[in-house]
Every structure is written in C-alpha cells, then in structure tokens.
C-alpha cells in the first residue's frame, strides 16, 4: 500500500508544477527553493502519535518509506497544526506533501488512502461498563468527554446523550498535552471518552490505569439528511499534495 502511495505521488507530479495560486504564509518568511532530490514534508513537531521533531511518530515512519521509494532525501518543515496550517505550509510552497490528511480534503490533491480509521469509546476497566455501540445502556451512566463539533457529536445528539457531554476544544490548547482527554478519564473527570482511534489507542496504551478501547460502529444520522456526512465516523486518510 505504501508503494502504491509513492507511485500515486509520482503520477500526481511535483507540487511546484501545478498551476495553482500561491498563498504567501506569514510576512517575512522566505520562499522555499525547490530541490528535485528532496522529499519535504510538512508536519506538526508535537503531535504524537503522528509526528514529532524526533521522527518518532507513525506518520514520520511512513514518510521515511515514501522518501526511500521515491529515491529522495527526507526533510521537514515543522509547523504547529493550528488555524492557518495549510496556508503557512504546503500552500506557501514550503513542502511537497502533508501526511495524514483526509482523502476528501478541499483544495489539495490526495494520494490513494493508506489507512482508514474511526472513533473509539474509551473507559476505565474498573468501571465494569460494557459499551459496544450507541445503544449500550452503560453509555447513559456517566460523563462523556469528546471534542465539541466533532463528528460523534451528531450521534450523541441523535441518541439524546448531549446532557452527558463534556466538550473539549476543537483546536487543542498548546499549553495542555495531546493526552488531555485520556488524562482526564484516568483522573475521573470523565467516565467515557469518545476520541479519534489513533489518538485514543496511543495514549490509552501508555496509561497506568487499565482502559478499555472499543471501535465505534459507523453511524448515519436519521434526523436530517444534511447531517449524514457530518455524522460519519470513519474516514480514509491520504498523503496530500498541492
């Protein structure tokens, strides 16, 4: 699958060959000079399990494989994944690709998906909960932590569970660790957490408190046809190029 990704990137052509308008990024930042021998990746320097400056994330490892398959030298443009991330990185021509983007992201070309993931329920093993899906009775017994305005919020609403919700910011507070939701679960601030699979699995595995992780079945809203896509819980992930 990784080799197919590399082939797809080659077929897509160089980011600099595409005739799209360039956004300038922040004032005073120099433009990057293209190098045919370089495979430059935009990534967050503090976003495990995906990436960090030490190259320990799984997206770092996939980028290494792609660079090797393409016969190029891997390099990075690190930028915190905040508002303006695309504008200040790939759209400002400071890299060739971004790993781990949704396959249907607007304004960027994407490779064939190299993995698919969804959301998970995470809860303390000591709670003796038995949660398998949205209709599980134990889901109504406690406080449910989730990112506000994320796709699972539609399912939470449709199952009359909004009263149990403990919402978190859509854009992470950089003063807090990426493990914040799992840390709060362990500390008893939440009884259940609904979180994106790779993040939940990574931090749950590191927890000293035994935690249960349950993949959430795909969901489609029945209340409003406009919510069908918003209620989607599983997504294809690709490499994005301009």
Language-model segments: which ranges?
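Short, well-ordered beta-strand segments
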Residues: 40-44, 142-147, 193, 240
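Bacterial N-terminal signal peptides
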Residues: 1-11
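Extracytoplasmic small-molecule ligand-binding "clamshell" domains
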Residues: 18-106, 174-175
């Amino acid at each position: 699958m990784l080799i197919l990704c590399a082939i797809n990137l080659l077929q897509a052509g160089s980011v600099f060959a595409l005739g799209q308008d360039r956004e300038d990024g922040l004032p005073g930042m120099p433009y990057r000079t293209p190098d045919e021998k370089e495979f430059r990746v935009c990534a967050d320097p503090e976003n495990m399990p995906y990436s960090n400056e030490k190259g320990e994330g799984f997206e770092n490892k996939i980028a290494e494989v792609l660079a090797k398959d393409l016969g190029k030298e891997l390099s990075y443009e690190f930028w915190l994944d905040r508002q303006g991330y695309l504008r200040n990185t790939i759209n400002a021509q400071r890299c060739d690709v971004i790993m781990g983007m949704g396959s249907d992201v607007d304004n960027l070309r994407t490779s064939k998906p190299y993995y698919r993931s969804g959301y998970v329920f995470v809860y303390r093993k000591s709670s003796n909960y038995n949660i398998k899906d949205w209709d599980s009775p134990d889901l109504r017994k406690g406080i449910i932590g989730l990112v506000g305005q994320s796709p699972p919020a539609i399912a939470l609403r449709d199952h009359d569970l909004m009263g149990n919700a403990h919402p978190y910011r859509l854009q992470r507070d950089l003063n807090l660790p990426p493990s914040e939701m799992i840390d709060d679960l362990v500390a008893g601030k939440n009884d259940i957490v609904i979180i994106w699979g790779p993040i939940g699995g990574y931090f749950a595995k590191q927890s000293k408190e035994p935690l249960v992780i349950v993949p959430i079945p795909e969901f489609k809203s029945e209340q409003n046809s406009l919510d069908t896509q918003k209620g989607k819980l599983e997504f294809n992930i690709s490499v994005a190029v301009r």
